[in-house]
Amino acid sequence: MTISPQDALTRCIEHREIFHDEMLHLMRLIMRGEMSPVIASALIMGLRVKKETIGEIAAAATVMREFATTVDVPAAILDHFVDIVGTGGDGANTFNISTASMFVAAAAGARIAKHGGRGVSSKSGSADVLEALGVNIMLTPEQVAQSIEAVGIGFMFAPNHHPAMKNVAPIRKELGVRTLFNILGPLTNPAGAPNILMGVFHPDLVGIQVRVMQRLGARHAVVVYGKDGMDEVSLGAATVVGELKDGEVREYEIHPEDYGLQMVSNRGLKVADAEESKAMLLGALENVPGTPREIVTLNAGAALYAANLAGSIGDGITLAREAIASGAARAKVDELVRVTNQFKK
């Protein structure tokens, strides 16, 4: 079933849903560059104002995956293969907590396929801070797979894996607000990681995104929203969790105190640029006491639970503390820098 972009826009204005097959058609037009930027931006904002449904998001993610340049990984690693990602758009401008957590989780035995880009709505995207650390992010899909094998971490720079997104990038940049594409990025991991720790920018998205992951065939998904507005597990407030496990979805709240952590404001986590983010990230991995280390420990613990290496978030936190205290997490940074730079011609 097809629908014209103009009819879809009318549907958005009237707060009516765009059906699965219609959304597939519209997304393919956008990804092929066959929809004018004016109509595409109007439609993207129309969906945002209407509020995207589970069906619309799942259909859009399906098309984005169709157009992606994928990374092949061996089936043997899938049980503990995880993505740690935030939708961005939370406006918090914190250091790269999910990127720091990635090094900790890998040091504790997870295999990570991290999918990210440069800062769009933040001061420092995952690609920005990794480059500041000296990581070569311009890898081929084969090199990403080799990096996962050698280090336990593969970073997939989104523009390399979603070439069709070049048709959307100028629109996203000019709009400068969070849109459907903030929601889609975490759903379209090019390595097909079946497990995920995903932070979202709005509480309504917790239940939506976890059910989208269910439709897309994820194994273990932990979707989180900090009630202080963070797209991470927060130290400054309760965190709303949507979890998909064994095919079932449940929603609940967790608190820092549940894990023996003190509730503290996240104000001290703000950074102005990638260099500041790098300094805070390294401090956390070097076991410097303070809020950065604690929030990384908390999020890495949740990632290790999502990766099926811990029976609970609390058990994951114990593993994360050990990985930081032993120096293994900090060593992962140097390992990733060394391995990725070997690929440079």
UniProtKB/Swiss-Prot annotation:
UniProt cross-references to PANTHER family, sorted A to Z: ANTHRANILATE PHOSPHORIBOSYLTRANSFERASE (PTHR43285:SF2)
Binding, Mg(2+) 2: 231-232
Reactions accelerated catalytically: N-(5-phospho-beta-D-ribosyl)anthranilate + diphosphate = 5-phospho-alpha-D-ribose 1-diphosphate + anthranilate
Cofactor binding annotation: Binds 2 magnesium ions per monomer.
GO cellular component, one term: cytosol
Family listed: Belongs to the anthranilate phosphoribosyltransferase family.
Metal-binding found in the keyword field: yes
Cofactors, names only: Mg(2+)
GO biological process terms on file: L-tryptophan biosynthetic process
Job of this protein: Catalyzes the transfer of the phosphoribosyl group of 5-phosphorylribose-1-pyrophosphate (PRPP) to anthranilate to yield N-(5'-phosphoribosyl)-anthranilate (PRA).
Binding site for 5-phospho-alpha-D-ribose 1-diphosphate: 86, 89-90, 94, 96-99, 114-122, 126
Protein name: Anthranilate phosphoribosyltransferase 1
Assembly and binders: Homodimer.
Pfam families from the UniProt entry: Glycos_trans_3N, Glycos_transf_3
Binding sites annotated in the UniProt record for anthranilate 1: 86
Species per Swiss-Prot/TrEMBL record: Ralstonia nicotianae (strain ATCC BAA-1114 / GMI1000)
GO terms for MF: anthranilate phosphoribosyltransferase activity; magnesium ion binding
EC number(s) reported in the record: 2.4.2.18
Sequence positions that bind anthranilate 2: 172
Keyword tags: Amino-acid biosynthesis, Aromatic amino acid biosynthesis, Glycosyltransferase, Magnesium, Metal-binding, Transferase, Tryptophan biosynthesis
Class in the EC hierarchy, top level: transferase
